[in-house]
Amino acid sequence: MQDWEKLLQDDYLEIAGRKFKSRLIIGSGKFKDFQQTKEVLEASGAEIITVAVRRVNITDPTKENLLDYIDPKKYLILPNTAGCYTAEEAIKTAMMAREATGINWVKLEVIGDQKTLLPDMEETYKAAKVLVKEGFVVLPYIFDDPVFAKKFEDIGCAAVMPLAAPIGSGLGLQNPYNLIFIKEAVSVPVIVDAGIGSATDIPPVMELGVDGVLTNTALAEAKDPIKMAVAMKYATIAGRLAYLAGRMPKRTYAVPSSPTKGVPFKG
């Protein structure tokens, strides 16, 4: 057991009663093939991988399937409703995924605009209400809006997934204060979704005290996805440890790091 493992041995990401050691979640899109997806997942140390039902053949056993490469006993396969633009589409997609896989978890995405891929909060909320009633563990992709985040918790969502920046933008964290407000507003896990561009974007997010971070494009479009996966693994750990350790206060003026008492020639 490494030093960081000892420090985090009792620290878990817990969603709907299920515990995960890793706070990094991987998206499965954009990789060149399923083999690379598997290698990146293993290198990242992640225990959850999201799967776009419309884009990966998890519902068609006659075609090559991501589940042929990833053991669902070892990882949580998290179907998502990427590509849906209405609550009705998202509900049907989630139902189809559950029927095909037996998985009742869903990362709920209802997109409001094709150019920005920002979420349609009204449609997402409508879909979430139905899916929660149907027995799903719902993790909605949302704006970094603390008011809406609380509404999603109130209807029974198991976590909320606010964006750091638009999907695939790689811009990194744009509004830390809203994420802090969301963390204060809800008691369910807050998992930052979208906008991560590199491993260096992760520690500032994790230091806010959020519970986890999801990334895909930053891995798939890296020059070396495996190395980036390893970097993100340790960036997530570093950010979490920094949050738990507690940073020093920021000050306007300098404070000497060495004692001045007894310094020669100092009056």
From Swiss-Prot:
Its main location: cytoplasm. The keyword Coiled coil does not apply. Its EC number is 2.8.1.10. It holds the Pfam family ThiG. Catalyzes the rearrangement of 1-deoxy-D-xylulose 5-phosphate (DXP) to produce the thiazole phosphate moiety of thiamine. Sulfur is provided by the thiocarboxylate moiety of the carrier protein ThiS. In vitro, sulfur can be provided by H(2)S. Homotetramer. Forms heterodimers with either ThiH or ThiS. This is Thiazole synthase. It comes from Aquifex aeolicus (strain VF5).
